[in-house]
Amino acid sequence: MKTVTQTLNVALGERSYPIHIGTDVLSRPELILPFLSQKRVVVVTNTSVAPLYLDELRSGLEKCGIETLPVVLPDGEQYKTWETLNLIFDALLAARCERNTTLIALGGGVIGDMGGFAAACYQRGMPFIQVPTTLLSQVDSSVGGKTAINHPMGKNMVGAFYQPRLVLADLSTLDTLPDRELKAGLAEVIKYGLIRDPDFFVWLEANLEKLLVRDKSALAYAVHRSCANKAEVVAADERESGERALLNLGHTFGHAIETGLGYGEWLHGEAVAAGTLIAAELSCRLGWIDADSVARIEKIFVRSGLPVKAPDLGAARYLELMSHDKKVQDGKLRLVLLREIGKAVVSDAATTAQMVDAIEARCT
């Protein structure tokens, strides 16, 4: 049954755009057609998603007279590179795509990030649409206009803020999502409860098992509430000069894990979960949250099947990797920490010694 369960709006003035969340909406081209500037689109996807959903998306568009050019990339965080990005540019140039050709990113966070960055760069900007197919991308990375590729020295270090024209989140794509990917997506869902929505955190504690068994109504609620939180934050602080930085809870430590282990060894959500526990540990050591709160946070990640212990890269290696973090200001590392469950702050209050202690306490 094709249904749009909810539509949200990311309010950015002339660059505002809708988020359609529904079931079997990939085959509803009428949701996409109003956002196309010409009768040709490029669909950037990967080798895992293409066999599942590319034909469904293409057939609906082609029945409406829209020519589709697929660009199928290798799957994995390790391919979020200049080399893979250039494959997109090669395809765009070979097909003589124009500035008003629309690029559709069909896939998870890696495809959305790379497709969006390619769109931001090609002929100095072409329109693009996000069609996220993983829980993580539906609740987080597809909304807000962050696009990037990785660098050997740090994750998402080369990129741009570039907003999509539309986000189309089809909950049906979660049916084929591997369990590990579903669990990884829950890390970003839980994040919203921790940083700004304590009632949502309570709901997640009560409904986590429903999400793990892919209950459609529970997933629809979680995706909608996560996107509503993200849309509010992005509308207030598009370029991450203030409140938007709070969305990076667990990410400073998490990005260090991903870079230190090698891209693709841990999924992004897995690294964020372990990183969030380090941040919670540090918040506790600063006297901002109590040990019971840390235990409560750890419990929901354990129930989600996510790692709560970080890999032992060595505290010095963590600090080295974190020194490249995008929140560093005047050479000083700023971290997203918790004042309570449901309230986060960006702070440079932690000393190096306190960071080391927290890292060592949460490493295996």
UniProtKB/Swiss-Prot annotation:
Cofactor list: Co(2+); Zn(2+); NAD(+)
Entry GO CC: cytoplasm
Listed EC numbers: 4.2.3.4
Pfam (any one): DHQ_synthase
Predominant localisation class: cytoplasm
Enzymatic reactions: 7-phospho-2-dehydro-3-deoxy-D-arabino-heptonate = 3-dehydroquinate + phosphate
Binding site for Zn(2+): E188, H251, H268
Pathway(s) of this molecule: Metabolic intermediate biosynthesis; chorismate biosynthesis; chorismate from D-erythrose 4-phosphate and phosphoenolpyruvate: step 2/7
Subcellular location: Cytoplasm
An annotated Gene Ontology molecular function: 3-dehydroquinate synthase activity
A GO biological process held by the record: aromatic amino acid family biosynthetic process
Binding residues annotated for NAD(+), in chain numbering: 75-80, 109-113, 133-134, 146, 155, 173-176
Recorded superkingdom: Bacteria
Cofactor notes: Binds 1 divalent metal cation per subunit. Can use either Co(2+) or Zn(2+).
Family, as annotated: Belongs to the sugar phosphate cyclases superfamily. Dehydroquinate synthase family.
HAMAP family, A to Z: DHQ_synthase
Function: Catalyzes the conversion of 3-deoxy-D-arabino-heptulosonate 7-phosphate (DAHP) to dehydroquinate (DHQ).
Identification of the protein by name: 3-dehydroquinate synthase
Organism field: Dechloromonas aromatica (strain RCB)
